[in-house]
Amino acid sequence: MSLDISQFPVLAQANTPNELRQLPQALLPQVADELREFLLKSVGISSGHFASGLGTVELTVALHYVYNTPFDRLIWDVGHQAYPHKILTGRRDKMHTIRQKDGLHPFPWREESEYDTFSVGHSGTSISAALAMAIAAEKEQAGRKVVAVIGDGAMTGGMVFEAMNHAGDLHNDMLVVLNDNEMSISENVGALNNHLAQLMSGRFYTTLREGGKKVLKGMPVIKEMAKRTEEHLKGMVVPGTLFEELGFNYIGPIDGHDVDALVETMRNMRNLKGPQVLHIMTKKGRGYEPAEKDPIGWHAVPKFDPSLFKKPATKPGLPTFSQVFGKWLCDIAEQDEKVLAITPAMREGSGMVEFSQRFPKQYFDAAIAEQHAVTLSAGFACEGFKPVVAIYSTFLQRAYDQLIHDVALQQLPVLFAIDRGGIVGADGPTHQGAFDLSFMRCIPNMVIMAPSDENECRQMLYTGYCYDAGPSAVRYPRGCATGATQVEAMTALPIGKGVIKRVGKRIAILNFGTLLASALTAAESLDATVVDMRFVKPLDVDLVKEMAQTHEVLVTVEENAIMGGAGAGVLEQLQKLRMPKAVLQIGLPDEFIKHGSPEEVTHDLQLDAEGILAQINAYLAQ
């Protein structure tokens, strides 16, 4: 259900940036107010990322008003904050479909709009892409401008500084907008700083500055004195030393909710030469009191009624796998003070809030720096501690070299608790945990476990904790657990051993992970044997051999890419054993998995009980 645009009379006149730029600047504050109200009501209908977008309304209006998008390139880092951008770029009437099957993509996406110049979803990529586009613009001599928008959280990633260091060296024309919502608008980020930013980005100041450089070129002592005087003057009100050292001209900080100040400053900066940083201060959740007070809790929301000023109460139900992990982590930390938990800025999502509060000296948030987080854990392991890295499957990809070089190569006992393995649903292809079994399985010294339910997850975590011959990984999905009876006592499982769950004939289903219930349901119709393999690596070779000897067809089931996944491991073992056998591999196809609810995606990929049965019957009919 789309919103009635007649409720937003000024916003109705700005369905595209071209239409926005036709409006008088005096109307921009009203555009921003109506855009914020539209966003509020739209996300209430659709669900989605919420607080970040509320904080970037004025910035989005100013960017599209000053810059000639899409000719000028605008790149959003991560993309949580880009909902206002989607609304202003011709997608207003489809906002109620965002993150839903066949609806708008959750992040900026090149295939969706010409205004989305770079597809995003992970943090820290915007400045590298913007630099490349700035270099291309200079080569084409088309007069194209390039802007990257990045949040203060993403600035903790090393890739950001690699890109800024390179950009400062090359000195191409580009603008980086640092959207700083870490603190509220303080007194010094008001009229004085807004005025100073406009002054220092204005033509008179920059002409005087560049002309002075030429005059003083032959007088190095005086030139150095002038440079230091300017730096001291700026340093009185400007916290930009780091950016200046990287070769960027720094302007700010200014109020990111003053659309007129943003427009005037950007107009001045649009024609500045070289790399520029505009530092703006914003407030996450701006304009909606509950989100302002709790921006983390309102980062992403289900469907809700904005007039109630609260999110819908969650119905009591099964714990999530993240909560199962969080409870296990607290339980094991009570027994062992050498347990250290590391996460790259995923405390809430990984179920670590209670642990961080109860065991603050054993908790390390490495920020959005996955490479650092993994090598930090390696260092802890070297010193005899028991590091546990809680990380999403999709983000572990970013630390692959560290996993190999710093952990596995040294056979260090680091336990990886890999959340969001498999289908995550609405966040789409940038966040599906499709590849972890494949990219870990080829690493020597790794033990990889895939629990079928929450009790097995708890026992596997304990198994990884006890294992000291190298790294281990427990890989579990997003969402609620299965309802299995949880055993509080923790027992280490025998490494590399599976369990037969159902005895049948002719067909043996070898299941890896939480698709076990669906596999068992499908097996009832087929009278098939079902095995909970538990270990992806080392594989239970004896059990695979037994199943191959006693059944005509083997079926492997996993919520991972078929290529290189657990099923591929079964085929490799059969080949090694010289046992030719009909094997059907069921898993994720060789494509990036689109967004939709987990149930919809699972059904479309034929990974539910009905789909597994259909795939097996189709294979048998060949």
UniProtKB/Swiss-Prot annotation:
Q: Which PROSITE patterns match?
A: TRANSKETOLASE_1, TRANSKETOLASE_2
Presence of the UniProt keyword 4Fe-4S in the record: no
Cofactor: how and how many bound = Binds 1 Mg(2+) ion per subunit.
Give the reactions, separated by semicolons, that this protein catalyses: D-glyceraldehyde 3-phosphate + pyruvate + H(+) = 1-deoxy-D-xylulose 5-phosphate + CO2
* Swiss-Prot/TrEMBL keywords: Isoprene biosynthesis, Magnesium, Metal-binding, Thiamine biosynthesis, Thiamine pyrophosphate, Transferase
Single GO MF descriptor: magnesium ion binding
What cofactor(s) does the depicted protein rely on? Mg(2+); thiamine diphosphate
Where does this protein hold Mg(2+)?
Answer: 152, 181
Entry's SMART domains? Transket_pyr (SM00861)
EC assignment: the record states 2.2.1.7
Which pathway is this protein assigned to?
A: Metabolic intermediate biosynthesis; 1-deoxy-D-xylulose 5-phosphate biosynthesis; 1-deoxy-D-xylulose 5-phosphate from D-glyceraldehyde 3-phosphate and pyruvate: step 1/1
**Its Gene Ontology biological processes?**
1-deoxy-D-xylulose 5-phosphate biosynthetic process; isopentenyl diphosphate biosynthetic process, methylerythritol 4-phosphate pathway; terpenoid biosynthetic process; thiamine biosynthetic process
Annotated Gene Ontology cellular component terms: cytosol
Annotated residues for binding of thiamine diphosphate = 80, 121-123, 153-154, 181, 288, 370
InterPro entries given for it? Dxylulose-5-P_synthase, THDP-binding, Transketo_C/PFOR_II, Transketolase-like_Pyr-bd, Transketolase_BS, Transketolase_C, Transketolase_CS
Return the NCBIfam families for the record. dxs, PRK05444.2-2
Into which family does the record put it?
Belongs to the transketolase family. DXPS subfamily.
Q: What does this protein do?
A: Catalyzes the acyloin condensation reaction between C atoms 2 and 3 of pyruvate and glyceraldehyde 3-phosphate to yield 1-deoxy-D-xylulose-5-phosphate (DXP).
Subunit text: Homodimer.
Protein name (database record): 1-deoxy-D-xylulose-5-phosphate synthase
